[in-house]
């Protein structure tokens, strides 16, 4: 009986304090920057970060970084090999480690508002290496940065 009560108490604590176990905003944003824009220059990485931030502050999307990034069918980088590598930074090769550190720095600066939005409010993007998605035809193009084209949903 005592074990059962302890287990229930632990479960209750987990439910009440799930943010303790959730990824912090900087880490989860850095992961998606790394996974989606590892081959991009600084501005390309900043642009990907801003799309996530724009979604967090939009009424059309979830209001947390983690929920925006994990929203189904949104970011192909989630659960990619690059995404998974960020859980084990000591195993990153020197080039990947530099890119991961850059992603962390960019994530922090974007979240803190120290870098302006180069996408002009974009909340979507796609890579130029794929055919134009149907959704892009219904949106306003805001920028082309590196290998991504950025779009803003209609208000």
Task: Report residues per predicted region.
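Initiator methionine at the very start of the polypeptide chain
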Residues: 1, 22-23
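Bacterial N-terminal signal peptides that target proteins for export
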Residues: 1-7
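Bacterial extracytoplasmic/cell-wall-associated proteins, especially those involved in peptidoglycan
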Residues: 23-155
